[in-house]
Amino acid sequence: MFKKPIIIGVTGGSGGGKTSVSRAILDSFPNARIAMIQHDSYYKDQSHMSFEERVKTNYDHPLAFDTDFMIQQLKELLAGRPVDIPIYDYKKHTRSNTTFRQDPQDVIIVEGILVLEDERLRDLMDIKLFVDTDDDIRIIRRIKRDMMERGRSLESIIDQYTSVVKPMYHQFIEPSKRYADIVIPEGVSNVVAIDVINSKIASILGEV
């Protein structure tokens, strides 16, 4: 008999430790069927634009995401049907030509900077988490990640942070904290918060 999946929303600023918290939850339930879906996968396709136009996109604004498509796919998973999730190419600043097949799972972790900003997404979630990390730590992590994984220059990262990332954090991301069921200071290093979250998930799954 198909059992409706649990959806957990994990948000916070860029470089704040959202993915680490999500992976800590994944690792705590080795026998459960858990998937992590990132909002970043649903950045809009920009193949019709020149590369010069693409790099100017504000990726921290709600309009950069095809959230309608994400909601549609989450509803498919909730109904027990597999979906083909888009894959975003950060170096080309548009979607790649490949997708990832995701089957329904017991738990679906939805992770991204704006997943609590959209009421329609929030309404699909059983647990909503906000990872609250100091600004200095987040920018250092972002610099390391974008230079190593996304081929960005230091100058471009700092320019984007001051002109886009920081203003968007205060306009859209930080205000969404009020919708969180649990706020996690310092992310995955907050062992007490992670234990509380895992206990709640276990109770829903019937593991306790």
From Swiss-Prot:
Keywords: ATP-binding, Cytoplasm, Kinase, Nucleotide-binding, Transferase
InterPro entries on file: P-loop_NTPase, PRK/URK, Uridine_kinase, Uridine_kinase-like
EC identifiers of the protein: 2.7.1.48
Pathway of action: Pyrimidine metabolism; CTP biosynthesis via salvage pathway; CTP from cytidine: step 1/3; Pyrimidine metabolism; UMP biosynthesis via salvage pathway; UMP from uridine: step 1/1
Family annotation (SUPFAM superfamilies): P-loop containing nucleoside triphosphate hydrolases
Main location: cytoplasm
Chemical reaction(s) catalysed: uridine + ATP = UMP + ADP + H(+); cytidine + ATP = CMP + ADP + H(+)
Sites where the protein binds ATP: G12, G13, S14, G15, G16, G17, K18, T19
GO MF term set: ATP binding; cytidine kinase activity; uridine kinase activity
Root EC class: transferase
Gene3D superfamilies: P-loop containing nucleotide triphosphate hydrolases
GO CC aspect terms: cytoplasm
Subcellular compartments: Cytoplasm
Signal peptide positions (record): none
Gene Ontology biological-process entries: CTP salvage; UMP salvage
Membership in a protein family: Belongs to the uridine kinase family.
Protein known as: Uridine kinase
